[in-house]
């Protein structure tokens, strides 16, 4: 009986034992039923400086006392280790901010045996608002070899474990500003945040055209030889006839030689790569213009290879290894035809930014992502068969072909399949027949409309309104009269056509309309139909039968209906590019002999290409 009563009513000794009494309310692992972080906008992509609102939800199984709940905002960069890479696993913290959302105040100094706070059994919600930092923020991404992550981490533990850690930062600061953390929390919950660093492509400067110049080595050797002969003859003439061949004051024989050499034109091969803008968005097309000046005629069906490349650089720090990985996103193979008269060629094409391309990431401590447009030009004049890796594997294994049923299956990874057929340009870069031009492209997040862009749009709207008014006025019969060939509407259309830059130079260009309306000539079958009313029924049947018979070819002496009028000009088709002319931009010279950082050697690694830096001491590839 006493034992049963003691279970219901505590004895005075047990009630006075404070240590045992507080242990009943102590936080343990089984004391919490659920503990998680809930955001108000869980699927939103956040920007730097925005405020994130949400709640920390705690569901306890029993009454709790002396607990602390903290919330941390952590941003970090992590590099994963792999068997085929020399990189070691590394984690770099960008920022780590911790706040206490529930617990005793720091100013209160209470004994551990006393109650500082307590929560009853059930569900408790703790709202919070966290502001994202504006600096040291990069686009969150998980690329397999590493990741850039931002998380909200909530932790719950006893108040005794909320202490100041021993670190050099806390040793130098005062006791009020020292950072406290919750060591060995009983429960934690993390929420991943998607963050994008905005890049406005309209604010980026215009890129400079990339120019590559090649000179004939035989011409340069002849120049050196002629210069030596000229200087020797000048010295001899000065010693023999000093008064007759005297040079002006301040001039030397070498200066005169330089002037004579500059006047001699040196045959060179020039290739210029132009891109109108520095930054583009996903899904937009990148216009590419190539201008080539050669020394002879060239015809190559696969002479130009244009590739849109993404390069990832991983850095282990000052004492670590730097590795680069390359991935081809888009590729074009264009023919190269050089004019046999002018030895010039102009190629206009475009590459589309894929939808799965993420923004450019630069300035990050361990990782960076850059985009390049790489152009390979075969100026040797010798055609080379271009085979992709998939074609090479198909030739090696001719039996490994798809069945007829597999051809009609929908492929959810069609983009990767198309990219697997791209040509590996590594072997062509090492060849002396190909020249390389590379320019960097920024992939941004948005494009703001500036005043410079709004002005052409207003002009375009005004021109459309004027053209619509002109088209309405053309419906009057007075416009078609031959008495006024020089009308203002005609000058307006002519000016609009001349303002459009043409892709190919056209000589004696004429607009596709005539000043004089040609006279109407009715066809012969119309006159026959009009005269059938005077014929009998038999003659009508004969004409109907003759119309069903095959027609005879026209005589050579009869003029064609196109050339019926001698003064009439035929309708001519013309092509043009509907783009605005850009002002001249200073050229940026690139030497072909200099190594290009974006195109070193690489190996195939997981659909990405590992770029191995070249070593001067050894030519072996790792």
UniProtKB/Swiss-Prot annotation:
Q: Which Gene3D superfamilies match?
A: 2.60.40.640
Q: Which GO terms describe its molecular function?
A: protein-macromolecule adaptor activity; ubiquitin protein ligase binding
Q: Where is the composition biased (Low complexity)?
A: 227-240, 451-476
Q: Which Pfam families match?
A: Arrestin_C, Arrestin_N
Protein name in UniProt: pH-response regulator protein palF/RIM8
Gene behind the chain: RIM8
State where composition is biased (Polar residues): 477-486, 560-582
Q: What species was this sequence derived from?
A: Candida albicans (strain SC5314 / ATCC MYA-2876) (Yeast)
Q: Which GO terms describe its biological process?
A: cellular response to pH; filamentous growth; filamentous growth of a population of unicellular organisms; filamentous growth of a population of unicellular organisms in response to biotic stimulus; filamentous growth of a population of unicellular organisms in response to pH; filamentous growth of a population of unicellular organisms in response to starvation; positive regulation of filamentous growth of a population of unicellular organisms; symbiont entry into host
List membrane-spanning regions: none
Please name the InterPro entries in this protein's record: Arrestin-like_C (IPR014752), Arrestin-like_N (IPR011021), Arrestin_C-like (IPR011022), Arrestin_domain-protein (IPR050357), Ig_E-set (IPR014756)
